[in-house]
């Protein structure tokens, strides 16, 4: 044995020495134990929480073990809301035959999560459960398999909620479902009972709480009280089984009497119906008897629906000149936010009935989407990244007000939304909604240009909620406002609605003119005056990032104007000048940078400007730095990962490169070379380090490979943001650098393998952060697939040879394939009017 150990040590020492002398690979191999887009097991289940719900309707999460958590149905996130709510099975005549239908409790819940110091009371953690679980996601479906030596039943759990591209209403339902399938894996008949149990977690405030009956289930209910109408809420839980027995009121007592007696009922298979009481029922249960012959399989469908029609959310200061809207128009029936579904359904009964009546059809259509998406032959890390981040659309990050308009946070704090107002400079990155739900995306453009923009063309980059005109008392966001102009072009090309463009274009033109007059008053084609941006600071002097937005906006407004036969000569002249300046004065031969300028401008000096800025302060020490280095929070000679972001957005919007392609590619290659780190152990990050740290890898926002790093560079410069990782990756791929782009994607997703972070919650300034939906751009990056509804042209420009991929348009979704240079289209839902196919620049016969 000793000899074997010595031999092993010698062998490993030799291998370690040999590897240390090997040349470093350009592209890192995946290191995660979880294979991309495959099943999660064991420790990779730890942090999984899969959102189930509707667009702007709230959600709950199905965890990797089968547990319920993150119950957020009150128009706000409640990240640590994990009420006592669980399913169970009891097999008659089997020792240890009663189990919670979940895998083992993740160890991080033992100690460290809220309230664990009190022993994890009022949870199901202490109840027997299945030995093993595995989890697989095929958005919007999640599947869990449970096995246990004591239970001769194979259990499959499927959680889902409607998600049908092009059908925003049925994708916005306050509903979800968990299907429990049981297959007798033994050789004899099994008598079992499925059950589901929940406390009344809707109880809140001083109003009456009760548990009410509903067909084959119960409703957890809280009546409104005079102090707070938003406390009103209902949550229905019911099955599709006519044999369902309902206990509407658990045993009432002290300490843990209710759960103790409920578990006794589960173990002994007591099927005793209990009527509802007037108020204060602690919880309720559903029981469904199951007889299974050997090899027989049965499924119990558990339907969940909720109804919380009011909130106390009102954001943004009203404009003093705003015209009060007519409540009959549906624009602002309440001074506070009300969800879209509150206008469709009058109460929980209507919501639950609609869910039950349309269940089969909605599942079929959602399955069509899932099958079409995962039919793709694209790299698994890409399919995982894109689909996992579609979960953001199920999360409380997204709200949809009563009249159907979309509004969103940037992300979610633990108990509230984070960073309000459909923030334009963050939502610039998000490419999913414009393709999956184009009509909803257009409501964002309508809000930006007709509600949040004043007569001078200034846009408030954070819109009010309920959506209405607000005061214009802060700087416009240069990247957000210029990006919005490009996105109008995108929405026009996706929808083919030229009348919409015609009506909106005067506002677009006013916005463009405001940007020119404010940031380029000398008409140089660059943003010279201090300009606010997504880093929550102002850049002083021209820089590559914001100039790329400027040139993209000038190109898009020129093309839209030409279509409408408008005079766009001024914009074209500025575009030409800006290109020349960026090439000649903002490019160092390898990448684009910033020329810091703070003197000789129209703007007052940085000290005066800082008085109206957010979180900026020129102390005595900072004033010394100002004289030495210039304004705080710049990037100067740095290599910025977002340095050509506007050019990426231009391509995502269907525009050509506004700048010399070789220079753009060179910049992206430099970002990959200098900013991607596969081990951050020695990286200094005094900002927000937990996005990526230690042995993890990530793409840094900025580095200074040629020197010139400032004492106080822009405030997030040392961080890693997934949204930027994906946009750089997809842009690299667009430019032909597939291996480099995929390396970034893998490095990012390895951090989200379920062991430490939730694979379905990429966070930045909050959970389910919107910027991460830049991942959707990977589809276009790899395949070049894009449909232009104005010209009825399907574009294909593959970077990976033959493929099959998903496409979603205004009128339907399906798959596009490329085989031996020939493209084909298969629509599985709706239709697509294609009059021409262009493959890599050449027209292909239909």
Located regions from the model:
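Non-catalytic C-terminal accessory modules of carbohydrate-active enzymes
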Residues: 56, 69, 75-96, 100-111, ...
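Beta-strand-rich N-terminal accessory domains
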Residues: 23-110, 376, 386-389, 393-396, ...
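Acidic/polar, glycine-enriched structural segments that form the non-catalytic walls/loops
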Residues: 21-33, 39-44, 48, 143, ...
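Short, well-ordered beta-strand segments enriched in hydrophobic/aromatic residues
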Residues: 176-184, 821-828
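Bacterial Sec-dependent N-terminal signal peptides
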Residues: 1-25
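Extended glycan-interaction surfaces of carbohydrate-active proteins
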Residues: 379-413, 439-472, 518-542, 583-721, ...
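C-terminal substrate/ligand-recognition segments
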Residues: 177, 288-293, 300, 419-426, ...
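Aromatic-rich carbohydrate-recognition surfaces in CAZymes
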Residues: 90-93, 97-101, 108-120, 184, ...
